[in-house]
Amino acid sequence: MQGVIAFLFVFSIIVIIHEFGHYYFAKKAGILVREFAIGMGPKIFQVRKGETVYTLRLLPIGGYVRMAGHDEDEQEIKPGMMITIVLDSENVVQKLNFDDKIIIENSVPFQIEDADLHKDMTLTGYFINSEEKVTLSVSKTATIIESDGTEVVVAPVERQFNSATLWNRIKTNAAGPMNNFILSILVFIIVGFMQGGVPTNDAIIGQVTNDSEAFVAGLKEGDKVLSIDG
């Protein structure tokens, strides 16, 4: 059991350091990082700082970074879906809630007909008890509460991975393996220091204590034994 726990711990550390490389360079490039997750599976804790939500998930197996437009699983939006939205004083959408277990103060029910949350930043549909179709503007800093309760920021096209320069995309993709390479070098150096030097088969005197027979005989640390009883 201890071996399994040790494996999961080490594997998670490796994956987290790998993903941090992607996270750091994506942030530097202006790519929207929606989520930095530790673990996999169902979410058990989340905290949002700025435009990134940091989550702790149930299964202690690695982690991942969700970059906008880079192989991420977005919230599915279908015509006819009933959600709740939060509007500001100018009727601009500031929050879209797809989790029916979460109740938000000052939110209003809305039935979706169409949504473009990348280019036009619009939401089309009907308010409850109304047959008038309306098209609302969506703020570029609006948030989406996904069906599992994770709250992420919308991803305008200019903040997506493919909108970054080629060089920034290369750096972001390569940063994960680069971090693992640096980690392996650091671990190698640390292990080397912990071993206390390079193993050798030479008969060389190590530490000599003051009350030992070797000390009385005049042996010193570093002396090389040439023969015994010779």
Describe the predicted segments one by one.
Residues 1-7, 171-173, 177-197, 201, ...:
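Protein maturation boundaries and topogenic segments
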Residues 52, 157, 201-204, 221:
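Envelope-exposed proteins and targeting segments
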Residues 94-95:
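An N-terminal, globular interaction/scaffold subdomain
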Residues 2-3, 159, 230:
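C-terminal recognition in membrane/secretory proteostasis and scaffolding
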Residues 27-34, 196-213:
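Alpha-helical transmembrane signal-anchor/signal-peptide segments
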Residues 206, 214-230:
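Conserved PDZ fold ligand-binding element
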Residues 3-89, 102-152:
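Small-residue-rich helix-interface/hinge motifs
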